[in-house]
Amino acid sequence: GTATCETQRLANFLAPSSNKLGAIFSPTKMGS
């Protein structure tokens, strides 16, 4: 239904952001 569609869109929107944040913060953690 619409709820599933909304959740899917939200996941698609947040996933790339999480990957970018992970790429930024992971080297910082490993560096320190």
From Swiss-Prot:
Compartment(s) of residence: Secreted
An annotated GO cellular component: extracellular region
GO molecular function, one term: receptor ligand activity
InterPro entries cross-referenced by the UniProt entry: Calcitonin/adrenomedullin, IAPP
Gene Ontology biological process: amylin receptor signaling pathway
Keyword terms: Amyloid, Hormone, Secreted
Domain of life: Eukaryota
Pfam families: Calc_CGRP_IAPP
Record family assignment: Belongs to the calcitonin family.
Comment field on protein domains: The mature protein is largely unstructured in the absence of a cognate ligand.
Its biological purpose: Amylin/IAPP is a glucoregulatory peptide hormone that plays an important role in the regulation of energy homeostasis. Selectively inhibits insulin-stimulated glucose utilization and glycogen deposition in muscle, while not affecting adipocyte glucose metabolism. IAPP function is mediated by the CALCR-RAMPs (AMYRs) receptor complexes. Amylin can also bind CALCR receptor in the absence of RAMPs, although it is more selective for AMYRs.
Subunit details: Can form homodimers. Interacts with IDE and INS. Interaction with INS inhibits homodimerization and fibril formation.
Name of this chain's protein: Islet amyloid polypeptide
